[in-house]
């Protein structure tokens, strides 16, 4: 059978989006891996699936697969594209929607200026909830990598993140340290790794090594986790502008227990069909 899909991106973090509300199919990890190949498939960082809700209090179910076939809990840039998709496809007439993910319920607000504001919910900072192996919650942790100690912050934005402060994102060892921290045994579900350069109290630069995808042009949950780490440690004040290789996100966070608000664009690139 042929499935309709839409190619989208949020700041260069690119997605294949499939509507399983009006279409019916059983998509498996092998399909994500096959379609995700940039040489022999469609090519994407993540596959986003729009499904009918299982929870009566939400509008849709939102599933995410990495290009390696792994299903993940959350994707912030994908959430903005999800919102743009369901409105453009007239799957809803609402401008504010709730969706359920493996990482919890998030709220999406499609603004008149075309920007999409996402309520990502409060960050999870308790190590067991990230999950991260540590005796107690702390602002930062020391992780041994190749015999060296690496200082990092850890948080979950529905998916696990480590954040390292660096002097320069250009010189940051993203491709050297990223995969080693991603697979570190103290992160039992692997981890996304952000390399954060604080420019001033309202502006930072960020590169992210994404779990199961490698370095991407942008990572929405990574930007949220980086902002939380920077605000908690007193480096920055909310709201903050996070500059990623693909563009800029605005992040607001009022402190522990409060939701992280992310605002940014979502762009439709093309429509297509793929054989299942």
Curated annotation (Swiss-Prot):
Q: What is its EC number?
A: 5.1.1.7
- The cysteines joined by S-S bonds are none
Q: Where in the cell is it found?
A: Cytoplasm
Chemical reaction(s) catalysed? (2S,6S)-2,6-diaminopimelate = meso-2,6-diaminopimelate
Enumerate the GO terms in the molecular function aspect: diaminopimelate epimerase activity
Q: Which GO terms describe its cellular component?
A: cytosol
* Segments forming a coiled coil: none
- Pathways involved: Amino-acid biosynthesis; L-lysine biosynthesis via DAP pathway; DL-2,6-diaminopimelate from LL-2,6-diaminopimelate: step 1/1
- Has the keyword Isomerase been applied to this entry? yes
Pfam families, A to Z = DAP_epimerase (PF01678)
What does the subunit comment say? Answer: Homodimer.
User: What is the role of this chain?
Assistant: Catalyzes the stereoinversion of LL-2,6-diaminopimelate (L,L-DAP) to meso-diaminopimelate (meso-DAP), a precursor of L-lysine and an essential component of the bacterial peptidoglycan.
Name recorded for this polypeptide:
Diaminopimelate epimerase
Q: Which organism is it from?
A: Stutzerimonas stutzeri (strain A1501)
Instruction: Name the gene.
Output: dapF
